[in-house]
């Protein structure tokens, strides 16, 4: 959902009289409840639609039942020889968008004033007025990919993460890690563990970070408009359509060059 989160606004800009609805948790349960285990890191992966689209002024509502035609990511125009065109652009081309009409496609989130206030309070409590980073280490750091069956490159992943964290060894990090921090082959300055924080607040806090770094995932994708994001590539050297031109994708060949951007 994160990588297409600008779509409601872009549709309204091009077609001012259109209505934009997204499926509710109930609708997603009806459609995909039998495969929800594919998203093993989430207690309920269908809640993500609310994490991304709540309070969005361009969304006309969440619907529980889908009685008419549904436009989804199979409706897209793509170049089979260039698979790394962002998915949202492929979908918008189906809607007759020209390139200049979808330049501002980077993910966006609309927080409530209450969410902003609560997020600022957490930042103030744990980081004060100092800069801080965001760290996200998921189960894609090590082990075997459930989708491809291939082993993740732990050696390269470790080298990449260590390189960034050693450069910013004095920077405190708000973090989420799949395992306990001490179980990883790297260390960092811990500011606050966000594991049990409301996801919308996590996203807000990450949006205020000096930068975010970690394994490639939608949570970091969601805040790349607001905070520089560095993510370990999932499909090097053949990126897929779940890319964003605002992200910095890290691999064993480019991570030192990318690190010097900050």
List PLM regions with ranges:
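Catalytic machinery of carbohydrate-active enzymes
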Residues: 1-262
């Amino acid at each position: 959902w994160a990588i297409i989160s600008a779509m409601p606004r872009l549709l309204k800009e091009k077609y001012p009289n259109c209505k934009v609805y997204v499926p509710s948790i109930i609708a997603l349960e009806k459609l995909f409840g039998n495969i929800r285990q594919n998203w093993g890191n989430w207690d309920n992966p269908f809640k993500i639609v609310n994490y991304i689209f709540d309070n969005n002024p361009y969304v006309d509502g969440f619907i529980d039942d889908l009685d008419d035609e549904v436009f989804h990511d199979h409706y897209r125009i793509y170049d089979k020889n260039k698979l790394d065109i962002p998915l949202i652009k492929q979908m918008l081309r189906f809607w007759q968008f020209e390139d200049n009409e979808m330049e501002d496609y980077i993910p966006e989130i609309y927080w409530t004033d209450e969410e902003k206030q609560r997020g600022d309070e957490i930042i103030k409590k744990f980081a004060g007025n100092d800069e801080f980073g965001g760290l996200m280490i998921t189960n894609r750091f090590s082990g075997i990919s459930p989708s491809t069956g291939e082993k993740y490159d732990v050696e390269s992943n470790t080298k990449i993460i260590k390189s960034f964290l050693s450069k910013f060894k004095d920077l405190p990090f708000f973090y989420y890690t799949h395992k306990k921090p001490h179980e990883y082959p790297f260390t960092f300055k811990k500011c606050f563990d966000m594991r049990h924080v409301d996801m919308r607040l996590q996203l807000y806090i990450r949006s205020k970070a000096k930068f975010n770094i970690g394994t490639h995932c939608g949570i970091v994708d969601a805040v790349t408009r607001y905070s520089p994001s560095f993510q370990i590539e999932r499909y090097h050297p053949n990126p897929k359509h779940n890319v964003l031109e605002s992200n910095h994708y890290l691999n064993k060949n480019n991570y030192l060059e990318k690190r010097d951007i900050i």
